[in-house]
């Protein structure tokens, strides 16, 4: 069980950065970072980004220096590497989620890509207006964001069609909606009750700003606090506060 760090060589925000990883567990990595005074906001899903001025202190605290390529190799070998695309950030990772078969993982990934991964199976619509979000009733008496499953067809066109359908049913005419991010299930050994493709299936969230009176059917508007009370335990929920905390990253307007 070792903490590894590569040389500060990655430019961002006017300085150079190193990557800090564990080859055994995220718990070990978080514990080391906390002891060293590295804030949790520096965690990027499978590593910490640390500024160059902290490099020497982290090595002195026990992190072992290694070249960048070797660090990536060790992270891959540990099984802790979380794949993501450019302009994506891992918000949360569940290494053994109780709602999935044993040996699975669920990652919540914020994205600035134009479209979700090809293995997307469900789209959800984050329709928002004046700090409120639109929700619809679920069969169990709760509420959810409006959603559509893609069915047998997948890929970009199927995502567009599902997004068109969910908008038509809830907010009227379809319009531009921006990808906020997605939850990715990684299930190497699905059991007979697992309903989604394996080994990977993605559940995407798209955002669209609408007028406050843009509501069809049985949807209702909830404030962000009310929505958090009802939906805060849903696996995709971290994408919602991430969206509202960085609204300039998303282009769609009413």
Where are these regions (language model features)?
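The feature represents the first ordered module of a protein
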Residues: 1-25
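A short, structured beta-strand/loop element
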Residues: 23-43
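A short, exposed loop/beta-hairpin motif centered on an aromatic-Gly-Thr core
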Residues: 41-47, 148-151
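Short, compact, well-ordered microdomains
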Residues: 45-84
């Amino acid at each position: 069980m070792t903490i590894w760090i590569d040389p500060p060589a990655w430019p961002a925000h006017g300085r150079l950065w190193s990557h800090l990883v564990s080859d055994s567990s995220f718990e070990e990595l978080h514990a080391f970072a906390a002891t060293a005074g590295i804030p949790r906001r520096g965690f990027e899903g499978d590593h910490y980004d640390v500024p160059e001025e902290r490099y020497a202190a982290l090595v002195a605290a026990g992190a072992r220096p290694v070249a960048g390529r070797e660090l990536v190799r060790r992270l891959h070998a540990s099984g802790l590497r979380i794949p993501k695309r450019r302009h994506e950030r891992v918000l949360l990772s569940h290494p053994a989620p109780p709602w999935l078969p044993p040996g699975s993982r669920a990652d919540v990934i914020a994205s600035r890509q134009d479209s979700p991964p090809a293995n997307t199976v469900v789209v959800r619509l984050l329709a928002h207006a004046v700090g409120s979000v639109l929700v619809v009733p679920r069969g169990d008496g709760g509420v959810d964001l409006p959603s559509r499953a893609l069915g047998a067809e997948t890929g970009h066109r199927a995502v567009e069609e599902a997004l068109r359908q969910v908008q038509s049913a809830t907010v009227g005419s379809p319009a531009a909606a921006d990808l906020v991010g997605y939850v990715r299930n990684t299930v190497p050994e699905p059991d007979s009750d697992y309903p989604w493709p394996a080994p990977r299936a993605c559940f995407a969230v798209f955002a669209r700003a609408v007028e406050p009176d843009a509501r069809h059917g049985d949807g209702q508007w909830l404030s962000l606090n009310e929505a958090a009370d009802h939906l805060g335990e849903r696996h995709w929920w971290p994408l919602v506060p991430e969206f509202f905390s960085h609204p300039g990253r998303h282009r769609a307007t009413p």
